[in-house]
Amino acid sequence: MKKILLLLFCCPFLIYSQQSFNFLHDGLNRDYIYYAPTNLPVDAPLVFVAHGFTGSAQGMMSYSGMNAIADQNGFAVCYPQGTTDSWGDNFWNVGFNFHSGVTVDDVDFLESLASFLQSNYQLSSNNTFITGFSNGGEICYLLAFDGSNVFKAFAPVAGTVLPNGTINNLFNPNMPVPIFVTHGYNDNDSFYDGDLYQFWGPYLGVDTLVNFWVNENSLTNFNVDTFPDLNNDGNITISKKHFSSSTNNEVWLYSHNNGHNWGDSDIVIEQEIWDFFSLYIYNSTQVIEQNENRNLISIYNLLGQEHLNSKNTFLFYQYDNCLLYTSPSPRDHQ
């Protein structure tokens, strides 16, 4: 039985929208950048991208490349900005030793901002995701442990978890969640194996965190693959994808022998992140189940642009019976 989406879809051209805004939270004016093609359909997905320590929303927008992925796949992007500490550095409150007296609740800020954007721009309340780099990856982990219903899946890059931080439910999350971890073996800012003595404060190793979420999601199988070294620089990325027939949740780990950065140059990590998020797109539009013989005519993305059959991208499949099938993953149509 296949699910058939009844949908009229029209998108003649793209106009891009990028603006900076303030959001009042707990008495603080918080900054963020909102980016989207202005002709996004109602109920489009929303992706948050959080900057690293000392970074900014503007810098993360330039660094991540996520706007281009949004243009190609039809989703909105929010680049939130942390608060500024007494040394003048922007940060997310994840429990660094030198922020021990800070009371800013960034978990609640991001959840509140996401809910506001969903309402204000008619974005999907079911399809909101978050990724982040370094300190931004750390706030992703905190949100994952929080088990919020606001964010559907999480993709921390080069981040970690500080057990002495601001969360009380470490290793006791409210619910299992899908998570995609990217980290370099030669990361000298957030060591892959964790560290007890860096000035950040004690933090956990990547394998400890990944194994926790694998167990939490009751995942029993995995696939391992190695990306080709396209530029012959010796930097290799290995993917390990954990899954199970008993749940839709997956846990991915992309490990590479590079340092503290957004990813290995052989892959487009922002596209990989969106591919992961696309697995968890929930379609709230009315569907009808039918079995039909059909031939594929064309494939469109969320913006109505004709699209190649890209792995794990949320697409609409038009068949000769004049109906559209939706899938977050082309494997549903194999």
Residue ranges and their predicted role:
Residues 38, 94-134:
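Gly/Ser-rich "nucleophile elbow"/oxyanion-hole loop immediately N-terminal to the catalytic nucleophile
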Residues 52-55:
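Active-site glycine-rich loops that stabilize anionic/oxyanionic intermediates
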Residues 16-46, 58-64, 72, 102, ...:
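A domain-start/cap signature at the N-terminus of enzymes
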Residues 179-182, 216-283:
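C-terminal catalytic histidine-bearing segment of alpha/beta-hydrolase fold enzymes
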Residues 325-332:
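Conserved small/polar residues in nucleotide/adenosyl-binding loops
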Residues 159-221, 231, 242-245:
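The feature captures the conserved acid-bearing segment of alpha/beta-hydrolase catalytic domains
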Residues 58-107:
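Active-site machinery of serine-nucleophile hydrolases
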Residues 279-306:
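Residue-level detector of functionally pivotal "anchor" positions at catalytic/ligand-binding pockets or at interdomain
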